[in-house]
């Protein structure tokens, strides 16, 4: 699980999801900028490479096939995971929590150019009032994803309050549907 740009691997939602999927192996990781103590997120090529490296480490440590991994994260982290998969990283599915469809107030700057390469199951979990993408905007954009997409809407914005248990349960149920 990859964190959003303003958070680290200890973000409450990421740890709730990682804890809930046990006994499956789950790893929350930090991007290189966070490890270096910087505040500004890495550029996409660096962040996508970090996703690839973390996926390779989990495959080696857990002795599983890369195509069985489910990758994901929150906001920036989820976007970087989806871009890594679009660029060819094998995965069984994507969990995208509070996906940043566009910057707040700039719906013309969509972050969806890679959606057409996501030929795998994708779970989106977002707040109905998220300034990074409304339910209507998501419905319009996810049709570009060739794989099956599931949208789950929660009350709230980009970081839905008191929703960790609901988000974790949603992810667990969705993972069970992949078997």
Ranges and model annotations:
Residues 51-117:
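Primarily recognizes the serine-hydrolase "nucleophile elbow" in alpha/beta-hydrolase
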Residues 14, 108-111, 120, 134-142:
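Short alpha-helix in the alpha/beta-hydrolase fold that links the catalytic acid
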Residues 170-178:
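C-terminal alpha-helix
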Residues 1-68, 79, 153, 163:
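Serine-hydrolase catalytic machinery in alpha/beta-hydrolase-like enzymes
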Residues 118-119, 124-126, 130:
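Short beta-strand/loop motif that positions the catalytic acidic residue
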Residues 31-32, 95-104, 127, 156:
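Active-site nucleophile loop of the alpha/beta-hydrolase fold
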Residues 128-133, 159-160:
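Acidic catalytic loop of the alpha/beta-hydrolase fold
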Residues 156-166:
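Catalytic histidine-centered segment of alpha/beta-hydrolase-like enzymes
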């Amino acid at each position: 699980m990859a964190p959003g740009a303003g958070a680290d691997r200890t973000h409450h939602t990421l740890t709730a999801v990682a804890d809930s999927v046990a006994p499956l192996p789950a790893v929350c990781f930090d991007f290189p900028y966070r490890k270096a103590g910087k505040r500004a997120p890495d550029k996409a090529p660096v962040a996508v490479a970090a996703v690839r490296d973390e996926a390779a480490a989990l495959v080696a440590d857990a002795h599983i096939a890369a195509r069985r991994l489910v990758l994901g994260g929150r906001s920036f982290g989820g976007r970087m995971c989806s871009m890594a998969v679009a660029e060819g990283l094998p995965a069984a599915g994507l969990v995208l929590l509070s996906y940043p469809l566009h910057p707040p107030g700039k719906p013309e700057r969509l972050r969806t150019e890679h959606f057409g390469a996501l030929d795998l199951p994708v779970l989106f979990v977002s707040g109905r009032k998220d300034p990074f993408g409304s339910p209507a905007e998501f419905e319009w954009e996810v049709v570009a994803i060739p794989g099956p997409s599931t949208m789950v809407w929660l009350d709230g914005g980009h970081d839905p309050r008191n929703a960790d248990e609901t988000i974790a349960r949603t992810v667990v149920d969705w993972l069970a549907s992949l078997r």
